[in-house]
Amino acid sequence: MRAGAYSWRSSAKAIERLKSAKSEIRSVARKDPVTAAEGVIALAHRIWPAFEHIDTSSGALGSAVNRTLEDLLPILIEAPADEKTRAKWLEQLREAILDDGVDYLAPIADRFGEIAAYPALKNDHADRDLVLIRAAWSDHARFSHVTTATLMLSCLLEAGRHEELLQLLALKRTRMWFHEKFGAEAILRQGREDEALAFAESLLRDDRQHWGYNGIARFCERILIHQGREEAAYGRFGLPSASGNTYLAMWRDLVKRYPGLDARRILEDLIESRGAKGKWFAAAKTAKYLDVALDCAAQPDAAPATLIRAARDFAIKEPDFAVQVGLHAIAHLLAGRGYEPSPFDIDEAVGHVMAASARTGQEDQALRELERLAANASADPQMLARLKSSIAEIEKGNG
């Protein structure tokens, strides 16, 4: 993590180093939380100088930094440090934030007030740039960015200076959630739940509703759930804000957030609201809703390769399901669907269909289904020829 240690294409190496650093700090935290907290600060200081020259266009490194800091911040916040020690830490973090070239340290700025811990420190860092920020936000003729604005808002919030925070935000020409979230939280901490909900939800009604949507939705969702309005929270904010790198991850995210709701219903709601039904096959299959999975498998956007793997994996434990999935895969291949399909995919799918049907004594019925598919004159010629060849081999073997 030395300055300039990573070159343009070193994103993967940098991410691995972050993982190692996080592991080291967590290990130390079990025995010496103060030293571990200082490790978090040292890491924060080194991130920008070390990663400055890396190509971050994919977003992978930024996400990794964000996750790392969010995971480590509790160590820094909860460390049993006295006021003098924390004052030193805050100066170091403030310097790192000011030097940060791409806002890597945003998670630290967001929780700066919590890191400060002591009232005097919260007020000190809230007041330092208050006049400058007030002047910058009052000048609507020019745009002025103040690097310490977020940490200042965090300190105002944690110091309990809620009305002052709201008055400051009211000066801004544009409303963006990365700052407005402090105002929403300030209203909520005063016990004005409905006002906080309206404040946050109002940001979804302007032209910038897509930026920061998930953060706004989660805030509103939290209020409604606290009020016992789970259905409203789910329909208005939970379902639209489901997130994950895969369709299965999106479903699991919602199931975890709404343990009181039927998991099957959540899956069906996601499919209906997000579309691309065929893409949900793997999620439905893994969730063990096989009837839903079969419905997904029949859709034109289902991936034949995924269906073929499922036919293989389920041939023993769910042979009827495997047969149907394999037949859908063949139908898609005949229609020319799939990513770089090969005639060998037909061979594999047919093999899984026949193997699964043999376990239930339905080989003849499976063969008739294959013949029905082979009767499609409009099918891809190469795929069709391969299917007919496979059928001939089966019939020859039966004979």
In which residue ranges do the predicted regions lie?
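Eukaryote-biased, non-catalytic alpha-solenoid scaffold regions
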Residues: 1-399
